[in-house]
Amino acid sequence: MASKLLLEIVTPDRKVLSQEVDYVGAPGIEGEFGIMANHIPFLSALGVGNLYFKEGNRTHYIFVSGGFAEVGNNKVTILAEVAEKAVEIDIARAQKAQEKAKARLAKAQDRIESARAQAALQRALARLTCKDAAQKAGTTTH
Amino acid sequence: MASLKDVQNQIVSIKKTKQITKAMNMVASAKLRGAQDRIERFRPYADKFYEMLGDLAAGADSSVHPLLEVHEEIKTVGIVLTTSDRGLCGSFNANMINAALKKAAEKKAEGKTVKFYCVGKKGAAAVAKTEYEIVEAYKDDMTHFDFNLAASIGNKVIDAYLAEELDEVFLVFGEFVNVASQPPNTLQILPMSSEAAGEEAESGASSEYIYEPSVEGLLAELLPRFVKVQVYRGLLDTSCSEHAARMAAMDNASRACDDMTETLTLLYNKTRQAAITADLMDIVGGAEALKG
């Protein structure tokens, strides 16, 4: 029995990642879920948040937004509109985005505007936590 | 008859033009390669996306989703026209615009209102001269666009469709067949035909999946994205076609320059010879007169 599974992350612009991993944790739309080898076929929508995978004793973090996960045959495919490895995340930009989103949220007039601001804020926060988690795990260089 | 100096000036100016067209040809070919790369990079995503959608559509009884629903009365038609921002690419933009305007005229003849969403300066400029309304024009975006552009166009038309402001949406783009051929293509993106969504349903021998949330919930997430994927594909194709068309146009221009230089050089030599002959005649005539 295989004990590893292949993780593939693709976005419209590029293939972000394709490698063998031990464990994948993904932010499902109805809560986080974990995938290990020999999982049964599974299809889920992803929310905005951090995906992480373990390889050996190292944990890597990736920010994803607007995606889907398909699991089957010891292969996890993530289709995301945006996917950034922790190392690629621009902290300064995320912080700026966070402040901007907060300001927009504060003076949002209608429901749509405030929902948009909230989504932007959520993305900025997720990026920051992603970088943070990766720094703690010491895997920002990967 | 043109003087010697005139012809020489003309030759010099044509040679300079040729330098420019040649440079543009090379730039276009480099950009074409880049654009083709992007299509290649997009392919894994698109393939996987269709596969997933196929699996889902096979699992679900053609479940009713507002984007699949055909509106009862079709009053307003939206056309998303993709063109380039810059000219000098032969008849490429004209072809796109003509295809879009033909579609618009067709719909108008059926008594429907037509609204335009224009990507690229050229299309927006051409449509602005017609009677049709431009809801949104994206200018200067074709040179460096990413999925966000497709997403924002997608969201615009989806919102309008759900609000029943639009009842049909078409995408006009330059299909990149190969370097020599980029015919305009018109694709209906809304309402989605369930065949398009379930196109690959039969090939996908779908295994028993666990779906989270439900099949319907997943479809609700996937279908709007399908619109964006189609728009993105259209944009990528158009940008590829634009560069290919410019390459061909500039190649033609360079060749035309060569032809003209050749003709002019011939003329130059003839004129020069004529001038020399005339001079000689003068000298000989003068010498004869002195002898006499």
From Swiss-Prot, chain A:
CDD domains: F1-ATPase_delta. GO terms for cellular component: plasma membrane; proton-transporting ATP synthase complex. Pfam families: ATP-synt_DE, ATP-synt_DE_N. One of its GO terms (molecular function) is ATP binding. InterPro entries: ATP_F1_dsu/esu_C_sf (IPR036794), ATP_synth_F1_dsu/esu (IPR001469), ATP_synth_F1_dsu/esu_N (IPR020546), ATP_synth_F1_esu_C (IPR020547), ATPsynth_dsu/esu_N (IPR036771). Its main location: membrane. The keyword Cell membrane applies. Belongs to the ATPase epsilon chain family. Produces ATP from ADP in the presence of a proton gradient across the membrane. This is ATP synthase epsilon chain. The lineage of its organism: Bacteria, Pseudomonadati, Thermodesulfobacteriota, Desulfovibrionia, Desulfovibrionales. The gene is atpC.
